[in-house]
Amino acid sequence: MASGGKKSLAQSIFQVGGNGGNALGPILAALVVQPFGQRSIGWFSIVAVIAILTMLHIGSWYKRRLLNATLHKKATPQPFIHLSRRRVHWVLAILVVLIFSKYFYLSCMTSYFTFFLIDKFHISVQASQFCLFAFLGASAIGTLGGGLLGDRFGRKYVIWASILGAAPFALMLPFASFGWTIALAVVVGLVISSAFSSIVVYATDLMPDKIGMISGVFFGLMFGLGGVGSAFFGWLADRTSVEYIFLVSSFSPLLGIVAGLLPNTQKKAVSQQ
């Protein structure tokens, strides 16, 4: 509704708020929670209340828009490309694999990067939180950049370059020195985080009459696979080591190669017009 035709950009702007909040978490933990204790977490409830009030206002606005749209209901939107039902399901399965490869790796980074740095380089907890902020901040920037590039160059290519392109940097990270580890983490965050908005918009282009369902499924997979990945790597770390789980997780972006099997929706859409 609010994208103005730039769907990937609109989706990335929506996501960058959440990613930006995640990035600020380690900084606030280092500057507020660590020196003042766990009770200081309650101070952040003020921000949550402001967010709730803002969402109530937006919800009222959206309700009016829905009522207006119902009165002026248009024909059911048609897919940008015409694929058989079986092919659509196959493409959606590929997108699920890509979501898995991305968020399985990110779950390891977001949950255990600080422990990895403390264990391998013996830095302080506070310093490790600043390093995690660098990774998450780069992820927020990458999310926004991915939306811009997806609208300009095509979502398939952004998805492909984002996940598979992060693989060499992820594979080098467990073996790097401290300085290079942080630099590689920033590059991985920038690159791998640029894919999700393009994945969601790509999926909704396949089934434009089920935007709510498709968005819900992929956002659910994002959180669900992240949680499963975090639990899995925690279990594996207890039986091996933190350094070992980073070695294992570094191979997951290689699954990005399956993005080459995706049809180029934007190119076909233009040829059909």
Listing of model-derived features with the role each one plays in the protein:
Residues 1-17:
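Cytoplasmic helix-loop-helix junction between adjacent transmembrane helices
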Residues 14-64:
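Helix-loop-helix hairpin linking two adjacent transmembrane segments in secondary transporters
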Residues 44, 57-82, 270-273:
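Flexible cytoplasmic inter-helical loops of multi-pass small-molecule transporters
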Residues 209-239:
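A late C-terminal transmembrane helix in Major Facilitator Superfamily
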Residues 90-134, 140:
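Extracytoplasmic gate region of multi-pass secondary transporters
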Residues 1-3, 194-207:
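Intracellular juxtamembrane helix-capping segments at the cytosolic ends
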Residues 143-154, 237-238:
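Helix-to-loop junctions at the C-terminal end of transmembrane segments
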Residues 157-171:
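Structural signature of the two symmetry-related core transmembrane helices
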